[in-house]
Amino acid sequence: MSSNVAAAVPAAVSASRKESPGRWGLGEEPTGVGPSLQCRVCGDSSSGKHYGIYACNGCSGFFKRSVRRRLIYRCQVGAGMCPVDKAHRNQCQACRLKKCLQAGMNQDAVQNERQPRSTAQVRMDSVESETEPRLQPLATPPALAGPSSRGPTPVSAARALGPQALMPPGHHHFMASLITAETCTKLEPEDADENIDVTSNDPEFPSSPYSSSSPCALDSIHETSARLLFMAVKWAKNLPVFSNLPFRDQVILLEEAWSELFLLGAIQWSLPLDNCPLLALPEASAGGSSQGRLVLASAETRILQETISRFRALAVDPTEFACMKALVLFKPETRGLKDPEHVEALQDQSQVMLSQHSKAHHPSQLVRFGKLLLLLPSLRFISSERVELLFFRKTIGNTPMEKLLCDMFKN
């Protein structure tokens, strides 16, 4: 990776290097650790007693943040039975918190500097009594102005997901892997070692750094774009079904889908593409000053803005984004694939997941699934060359995008 790109994504690169080697169950379990010295939540090595039980630093820190910030979690898979162990503890925050409470962690033991301990409560549907199930709507955060310097913020993270449809075990596993990949790419510097995905009741959104076309604002957009691209590559790598494909197929699929993955990520994480100053300067980014190129740039800009509006109108949720990313990644018609049948099967599974999720969580929107599918072709109306020119040319210079993707993939 070029020095410019390396400088543009230090947080993402640093975070990826901090990942636990056992996330996918590939790391060795600690030896010589008795049951009393293991974390009662995830089974990792305990660092002592935390909030009444033996726990590791990761689970104790997760529990403390959840209680202090009064965080709301939903089981994104919906069954409330996600595995919580060393390799999968970051997969589902709802099930992790549920297990913390079941293991005996004491909420009142959490010291809260901002409010009395009696008001430090955690509200989570999956912890409620099974005899009285009910759903509480989550507060929708105000419109996001754009990613802050701490990293992008998901536009739909606080939206209620509703009940989960019954699905075969194989589909459940596939959905869980998609959500796991989503979780592993939601990074903030303070939580980089655990990859915690949280939803706060009272989020604070900073002012947008993109309100003008100043050099500082443009630099912020280029830096955030590089980070989003890195996260898109990392998301694909974190999909077990993707990493199980022949390496050549992985490279081909990623080179084919990178611009669509980037645009989906930019929309999901609220990069303000609709009023981005880069899009307001077509004469500076159209690759030349000819009238034809300016007209093409203007048309692509209009299509992009219309696409963003359609995503916002549908209020696409995180699970739908995950399924849509999988749909644009797994294209069996891509030339040169060694195993197109396997890729087609993965695309079919992604489509089934999206359909089932839409029916289960938006039962009154009978045409929602179709509308979501119709959003995807519009992402291809903006050429990858145009996306590269707008968001990455200043950062990578003349470095071929294929080389950049390869460097990110190998990182």
UniProtKB/Swiss-Prot annotation:
<comment type="function">
    <text>Orphan nuclear receptor of retinal photoreceptor cells. Transcriptional factor that is an activator of rod development and repressor of cone development. Binds the promoter region of a number of rod- and cone-specific genes, including rhodopsin, M- and S-opsin and rod-specific phosphodiesterase beta subunit. Enhances rhodopsin expression. Represses M- and S-cone opsin expression.</text>
</comment>
<keyword id="KW-0539">Nucleus</keyword>
<dbReference type="GO" id="GO:0045944">
    <property type="term" value="P:positive regulation of transcription by RNA polymerase II"/>
</dbReference>
<keyword id="KW-0863">Zinc-finger</keyword>
<feature type="DNA-binding region" description="Nuclear receptor">
    <location>
        <begin position="36"/>
        <end position="112"/>
    </location>
</feature>
<protein>
    <recommendedName>
        <fullName>Photoreceptor-specific nuclear receptor</fullName>
    </recommendedName>
</protein>
<keyword id="KW-0238">DNA-binding</keyword>
<dbReference type="GO" id="GO:0030182">
    <property type="term" value="P:neuron differentiation"/>
</dbReference>
<feature type="compositionally biased region" description="Polar residues">
    <location>
        <begin position="108"/>
        <end position="121"/>
    </location>
</feature>
<dbReference type="Pfam" id="PF00105">
    <property type="entry name" value="zf-C4"/>
</dbReference>
<dbReference type="GO" id="GO:0004879">
    <property type="term" value="F:nuclear receptor activity"/>
</dbReference>
<feature type="region of interest" description="Disordered">
    <location>
        <begin position="108"/>
        <end position="157"/>
    </location>
</feature>
<dbReference type="Pfam" id="PF00104">
    <property type="entry name" value="Hormone_recep"/>
</dbReference>
<keyword id="KW-0804">Transcription</keyword>
<feature type="zinc finger region" description="NR C4-type">
    <location>
        <begin position="39"/>
        <end position="59"/>
    </location>
</feature>
<dbReference type="InterPro" id="IPR035500">
    <property type="entry name" value="NHR-like_dom_sf"/>
</dbReference>
<feature type="cross-link" description="Glycyl lysine isopeptide (Lys-Gly) (interchain with G-Cter in SUMO)">
    <location>
        <position position="186"/>
    </location>
</feature>
<keyword id="KW-0479">Metal-binding</keyword>
<dbReference type="GO" id="GO:0005634">
    <property type="term" value="C:nucleus"/>
</dbReference>
<feature type="zinc finger region" description="NR C4-type">
    <location>
        <begin position="75"/>
        <end position="95"/>
    </location>
</feature>
<dbReference type="InterPro" id="IPR001723">
    <property type="entry name" value="Nuclear_hrmn_rcpt"/>
</dbReference>
<dbReference type="InterPro" id="IPR001628">
    <property type="entry name" value="Znf_hrmn_rcpt"/>
</dbReference>
<feature type="domain" description="NR LBD">
    <location>
        <begin position="170"/>
        <end position="411"/>
    </location>
</feature>
<dbReference type="InterPro" id="IPR050274">
    <property type="entry name" value="Nuclear_hormone_rcpt_NR2"/>
</dbReference>
<dbReference type="InterPro" id="IPR000536">
    <property type="entry name" value="Nucl_hrmn_rcpt_lig-bd"/>
</dbReference>
<keyword id="KW-0862">Zinc</keyword>
<keyword id="KW-0805">Transcription regulation</keyword>
<feature type="cross-link" description="Glycyl lysine isopeptide (Lys-Gly) (interchain with G-Cter in SUMO)">
    <location>
        <position position="331"/>
    </location>
</feature>
<dbReference type="GO" id="GO:0008270">
    <property type="term" value="F:zinc ion binding"/>
</dbReference>
<dbReference type="InterPro" id="IPR013088">
    <property type="entry name" value="Znf_NHR/GATA"/>
</dbReference>
<keyword id="KW-0675">Receptor</keyword>
<comment type="similarity">
    <text>Belongs to the nuclear hormone receptor family.</text>
</comment>
<dbReference type="GO" id="GO:0000978">
    <property type="term" value="F:RNA polymerase II cis-regulatory region sequence-specific DNA binding"/>
</dbReference>
<comment type="subunit">
    <text>Homodimer. Interacts with PIAS3; the interaction sumoylates NR2E3 and promotes repression of cone-specific gene transcription and activation of rod-specific genes. Component of a rod photoreceptor complex that includes NR2E3, NRL, CRX and NR1D1. Interacts with NR1D1. Interacts (via the DNA-binding domain) with CRX (via its DNA binding domain); the interaction represses S- and M-cone opsin expression. Interacts with SAMD7.</text>
</comment>
<keyword id="KW-0832">Ubl conjugation</keyword>
<keyword id="KW-1017">Isopeptide bond</keyword>
<feature type="cross-link" description="Glycyl lysine isopeptide (Lys-Gly) (interchain with G-Cter in SUMO)">
    <location>
        <position position="338"/>
    </location>
</feature>
